[in-house]
Structure formats: C-alpha cells, structure tokens
C-alpha cells in the first residue's frame, strides 16, 4: 500500500506538467499503471481473474 502522503502529493497539480504521473486507483502503486483501466498490473490481474472488469479475458493461443 502506498503512503497516504504520496497519494495526496500525486493528486495535487504539479508545477510543471511533465511531472504528473499516474497511480493505481485501488492500491496507489505508481509503476506499471494501465491508463485505459487506471489500475496497476497487480490489481488488473486480480480483478480480471475475478471477473470484475467487463470485457477483459485471459489470452490463450
């Protein structure tokens, strides 16, 4: 779980636009966040396997 202070800091508008970064909506993780879902890879995999994300299916080929 991310620190609450870091989550609050990320929500503020930065002085320079290039300093803005995404965080996971569920756990607050700053790395490997998928923009389409707003979730990190860990939460995306967990919620996807539980069937909580409509239209998301596990790939097999």
From Swiss-Prot:
GO terms for cellular component: cytoplasm; small ribosomal subunit. The keyword rRNA-binding applies. Its cofactor is Zn(2+). The keyword Cytoplasm does not apply. Part of the 30S ribosomal subunit. Contacts proteins S3 and S10. Binds 1 zinc ion per subunit. One of its GO terms (molecular function) is zinc ion binding. Keywords: Metal-binding, Ribonucleoprotein, Ribosomal protein, RNA-binding, rRNA-binding, Zinc. Zn(2+) binds at residues 24, 27, 40, 43. Binds 16S rRNA, required for the assembly of 30S particles and may also be responsible for determining the conformation of the 16S rRNA at the A site. Belongs to the universal ribosomal protein uS14 family. Zinc-binding uS14 subfamily. One of its GO terms (biological process) is translation. It comes from Helicobacter pylori (strain G27). This is Small ribosomal subunit protein uS14.
